[in-house]
Amino acid sequence: MEREKQWIVRVVWRVSERQISRWRGIVTYKIRNKQLPWEYRHHWQVQWQFWTYSQFIIPLSKDDYIEVNIYHNLTPERGWLSSHGVGLSYYHQKGYKTEVDPGTADRMIHLYYFNCFTDRAIQQAIRGEKYTWCTFKEGHKGQVQSLQLLALVAYTNGIRKRSKRTFTRMAGNLGSRQGAMGRMATRHAQGSKRRSQKALWNEHANPSMELLCRGGKET
C-alpha cells in the first residue's frame, strides 16, 4: 500500500546556497578528519522527507541529538524554486522532540564539543600560566556573560594579536634574501596577493548554527 504524503509545519530559516556550502564544507572537513563524530546523510538516504537536500545528525549524548535538515525548492507556488532553508530540531530517544533556534543549538553543541575556559582559568591567567581557551565563542551568544568570562576573552584576544604581530615581524625580518624559506614565510605572513585575502573558510572555523542561519529569515 502506497504511503500517503503528510504535511507538517515547522520553523525554517531561509538561507543562501553560499551559506550552506560554507557551513557544509566546514562540517564535512571535520568529519573526514575525525574531529567531529557527526553524521552526514545525503538526500537519497533520508526517507519520506520530501524537499530535504541533506541532513546532519549531531549526537549530544547517548539519549539525545540535534538534527539539521537542509531543504531546497521551498514553496514553489511563490516562485522560491531556487531557495534553501534550514530546520533545527532537538530529539530525545524517549519520544520528546522540539524545534530549536540557532543560538540555542550552538549553546547545546558547546556543552558537548569544543574547549572552553575552566573555573581555574582566571587564576592561571593572573599567574601567567597556560590555560584552556574557549574555541567556540558562538556558544556564548545571547547569554548574560560574567565579568570573569569577559575578562578572559579580552585577555585571550590580546595574546592572539601579540602572537600574530610577533610572527609577522619575524617573517618580515627573514627577508627575500634568505632564500626560499624567507620568501615562503613572508608570503604566509602577508597573505596571497593574487586572490582575495578573505578565505571561504579554514580548518579552524567552527560549524556554528549562527554561521549557517545568520541573515536568514524565520518563516
UniProtKB/Swiss-Prot annotation:
Entry GO CC: host cell cytoplasm; host cell plasma membrane; membrane; virion component
Coiled-coil stretches noted in the UniProt entry, renumbered to this chain: none
GO biological process, one term: viral life cycle
Region (Multimerization): 153-165
Positions of modified residues (Phosphothreonine): 98
Main location: host cell
Motif segment (HCCH motif): 110-140
Pfam families per record: Vif
Membrane topology field: Peripheral membrane protein
Induction: Expressed late during infection in a Rev-dependent manner.
Subcellular location field: Host cytoplasm; Host cell membrane; Virion
Top-level taxonomic group: Viruses
Physiological role: Counteracts the innate antiviral activity of APOBEC3G. Forms a complex with host APOBEC3G thus preventing the entry of this lethally hypermutating enzyme into progeny virions. Functions as an adapter molecule, recruiting APOBEC3G to the ubiquitin-proteasome machinery. Targets APOBEC3G for degradation through the assembly with elongin BC complex, CUL5 and RBX1. Binds viral RNA and affects the stability of viral nucleoprotein core. May play a role in viral morphology.
Similarity comment text for this entry: Belongs to the primate lentivirus group Vif protein family.
Name of this protein: Virion infectivity factor
Native source organism of the sequence: Simian immunodeficiency virus agm.grivet (isolate AGM gr-1)
Organism taxonomic ancestry: Viruses, Riboviria, Pararnavirae, Artverviricota, Revtraviricetes
Gene that this sequence comes from: vif
